[in-house]
Amino acid sequence: MPSMRVTTDTWPRRAAQEPLLLLLLRSSLMKSASLQALNPNRAMAAMGRSVRVVLDSSVLLDPSGVTAEEEEVVVALRPGAEALLRRLRYSNLRVAICHPEGLTTNESGFLEKTAKLYSFGYMPLTSPSGSNLLNELMLEWSETNFCFYVTSGVHEGLLSELQNHNWEVIAMGNEDVIKNSGVIHISMLQELLITLATSIKKEIGNSSAFVVGYVMKQSREEDFAKRGAFPIYPSKNDLIFVPLSFELPLASQLQEVDLVLHKITDEIINIDPNSSISFPKGISFSPGMSEIIRFVEEHCDFCVIDPFKNIYPLLDRIQIQEILIRLEGLSAEGRPKLRAPCFLKIESFCGSELQKQLAEAKLSFPLIVKPQVACGVADAHNMALIFKIEEFSNLSVPLPAILQEYIDHGSKIFKFYAIGDKIFHAIKNSMPNASHLKSSSGGKPLTFNSLKTLPVATKEQLLQNEVQDSKLLDINLVEEAAKLLKELLGLTIFGFDVVVQESSGDHVIVDLNYLPSFKEVPDNVAMPAFWDAIKQSYESRKQMTQT
């Protein structure tokens, strides 16, 4: 968010405004007392009710914005505030930003725009209109009896009023500033989310509620969060999600959560190309992920979804092929053949025996060339489609690599997702048949990144395929494969891609991955399945460690 400049430093005036805030709050809180008496058991009442979080401007605005030369104040969010607000936006908590009377127009305007940007409530506590607004809000909130007030330092009288009416107060900063024993203290803004999560679990008092700490790259987290995957307010099956922060001591965070959901491949720094691919050998993880791995190794009863050793095979396309070959036993008379694509591992593109090796592997052109490392490094998805052996020269695909048959599949790919015990699938447009690709290649290898620049069939090519008598997908066969894969892999959530070969009707599994986005599955179906899968996996693993 862009910063704003104002000409007057208003921070010294904040303390003088606290008595006004206290005055405005008192009348509303007194009116709510009788309603609270009707519902004294807050722990039992918490589930199914809203959780409110009021963020005082003091925890959001950066107090160090004065420039000595210009004597101006830069109105901006303090470090860590933007990430906090982004996560709170999709937390299912009801959040409001408040500020006392006395801020400049630029400061209050900045806060109002911030609240609007993140879809939060905005509460300018000014008199007289602010009093009426606050009265109305407090009367409404009194029915929830589950509110947090977050500040970096307030009037002691205000704290007492809030606590007398069952508000939780979280104060950031030096504990010596606030002597009130009932205040929850945090030293950094990054501690707020895990503090909220553990406080909510404590207030619920429900033994079936679990705190899930999660680790993944920011873009993936945001994609999941926007779909409602990571609520801090408990999900329908009592899961509370909170991101693990590498800016804070991890050991203390891991002691506060019940389990960790991770995308370990997001935290790979490097894979040594000179080491034999026998993961985790040769993998360098981020310092934070390395610490989590050590913690899990030292605490064998700690639950991670999924165990690291179960995921390592999916980093290697050779191991993926070997896993898929084990599914071929599902094929039977009267059913399509289920198989992995024919493949060959190569260490060099210049070998004199390459033509012979291709024949022995039953491979013919065109071929897809893929790096053996399947994910976690920048070039893992750099691939090529080649149409003759001469095109191997000067190929830029990383080695070692696998050569895989290209399957004409009518430009349709079936994406399957196993989420716990539930299996979903979606149909997507895919690469056109080889004849179309060859005509557009210009006699050169067709290079692409499978995540970014995958060549997809044109509308005309899709229409041609629709007219053709395409083979139908055997859903039952693929679902059986999904169940067997779940047993073989020991994974809670995974995905795989199936294409149906036009010439034979063979069902060929061409890709396998851990914790996919499953964005093709509607959120109202996917998210409950996602939460159930996590909880069932956790309870199953805990039961195993206790026996």
From Swiss-Prot:
For this UniProt record, give its keywords in alphabetical order, as a comma-separated list.
ATP-binding, Kinase, Magnesium, Metal-binding, Nucleotide-binding, Transferase
Known catalytic reactions: 1D-myo-inositol 3,4,5,6-tetrakisphosphate + ATP = 1D-myo-inositol 1,3,4,5,6-pentakisphosphate + ADP + H(+); 1D-myo-inositol 1,3,4-trisphosphate + ATP = 1D-myo-inositol 1,3,4,5-tetrakisphosphate + ADP + H(+); 1D-myo-inositol 1,3,4-trisphosphate + ATP = 1D-myo-inositol 1,3,4,6-tetrakisphosphate + ADP + H(+)
Q: What is its EC number?
A: 2.7.1.134, 2.7.1.159
- Which residues are listed for ATP binding in this entry? 317, 370, 404-415, 430, 450
Domain of life where this protein originates:
Eukaryota
Which cofactor does this sequence's record say it needs?
A: Mg(2+)
Q: Where does Mg(2+) 2 bind?
A: 511, 513
Copy out the cofactor comment: Binds 2 magnesium ions per subunit.
A biological process (GO) annotation for this entry? inositol trisphosphate metabolic process
Q: Which residues does the annotation say bind 1D-myo-inositol 1,3,4-trisphosphate? A: 263, 381, 415, 513, 517
Please tell me where Mg(2+) 1 binds in this chain.
497, 511
MF GO annotations: ATP binding; inositol-1,3,4-trisphosphate 5-kinase activity; inositol-1,3,4-trisphosphate 6-kinase activity; inositol-3,4,5,6-tetrakisphosphate 1-kinase activity; magnesium ion binding
Q: Name one GO cellular component term.
A: cytoplasm
Question: ATP-grasp domain spans which residues?
Answer: 327-539
Pfam short name (any one) = Ins134_P3_kin
Self-association state and partner proteins as the record states: Monomer.
Family in the record: Belongs to the ITPK1 family.
Its recorded name reads Inositol-tetrakisphosphate 1-kinase 6
Q: Which organism is it from?
A: Oryza sativa subsp. indica
> Which gene underlies this protein?
ITPK6
